[in-house]
């Protein structure tokens, strides 16, 4: 087994050769084009795709539900404040003067309204763009123990490639065409500006984080979001089994850079 970035050396050293593909499985009916491109060198297929690494948005589902409830409560509270004022001569009935059963019914109705609206917020909560992510960070009243809404490894391009990968061209699809390089284009520059703003917003110092540390912080409930790779599922499930992870979590595609610029994950 070799990683795709070692295939060129293996081929040039005579340790790998063109795959005969006698059964005809090396096509997009069986593999995504990205996988086929990863095992292609000099327009020759020199390996079979076995597995791949990618980055994904990992989120604390319980915190996201808490955020959804907070937004529902704020919206309903705002609606109450905007109700028409009491007119002259109209009687104001204090809640304390209501019979206990009516008070209970009102509380139950209020809770039902909050829960219903919170479900709507939660159903649409996963960020589609970086702006959506920043909006959650801006409006989340973090409970005790939460140190930040999002933290990820800012040192490794692998966990940051999603934000520029759709527009930064290095070697074409297979990655070995020295004549196909374009990193100084308007789209890539815009993506990097968004990345810079994102990093500054969450104020992540590169010398204070590693991939292991940000995943551990997520397990400890210190963050709502992080960026994980293929191995994160195993690590989270192991933490859940030994009791160190005490919440529900989910995994989603990385959000787009903006409404106009797509991400790659």
Task: Go through the PLM ranges and name each one.
Residues 11-15, 62-69, 138-145, 196-203, ...:
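Sec-exported extracytoplasmic/periplasmic mature domains
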Residues 134-140, 176-211, 254:
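Glycine-centered hinge/linker elements that transmit conformational signals in sensory
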Residues 1-36, 49-59, 124-134, 150-162, ...:
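Ligand-binding clamshell of periplasmic/extracellular solute-binding protein-like
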Residues 4-56, 65-67, 74, 78, ...:
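Hinge/lid segment of periplasmic solute-binding proteins
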Residues 42-50, 55, 83-180, 223:
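Extracytoplasmic/periplasmic solute-binding protein
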């Amino acid at each position: 087994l070799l990683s795709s970035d070692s295939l060129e050396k293996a081929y040039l050293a005579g340790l790998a050769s063109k795959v005969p593909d006698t059964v005809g499985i090396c096509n997009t009916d069986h593999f995504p084009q990205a996988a086929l491109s990863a095992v292609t060198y000099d327009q020759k297929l020199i390996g079979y795709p076995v597995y791949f690494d990618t980055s994904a948005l990992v989120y604390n589902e319980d915190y996201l539900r808490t955020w959804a409830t907070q937004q529902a409560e704020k919206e309903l509270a705002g609606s109450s404040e905007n109700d028409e004022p009491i007119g002259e001569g109209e009687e104001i009935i204090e809640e304390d003067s209501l019979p206990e059963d009516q008070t209970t019914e009102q509380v139950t109705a209020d809770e039902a309204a909050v829960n219903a609206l919170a479900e709507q917020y939660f159903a649409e909560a996963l960020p589609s763009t970086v702006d959506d992510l920043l909006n959650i960070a801006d409006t989340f009243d973090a409970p005790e123990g939460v140190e930040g809404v999002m933290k990820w490894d800012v040192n490794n391009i692998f966990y940051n490639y999603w934000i520029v990968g759709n527009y930064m061209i290095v070697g074409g699809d297979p990655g070995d065409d020295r004549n196909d390089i374009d990193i100084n284009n308007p789209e890539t520059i815009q993506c990097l500006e968004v990345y810079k703003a994102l990093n500054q917003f969450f104020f992540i110092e590169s010398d204070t984080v590693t991939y292991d540390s940000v995943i551990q912080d997520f397990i400890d409930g210190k963050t709502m979001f992080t960026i994980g790779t293929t191995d994160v599922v195993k690590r989270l499930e192991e933490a859940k089994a030994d009791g160190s992870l005490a919440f529900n979590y989910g995994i989603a595609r990385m959000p787009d850079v903006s409404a106009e610029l797509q991400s790659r994950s």
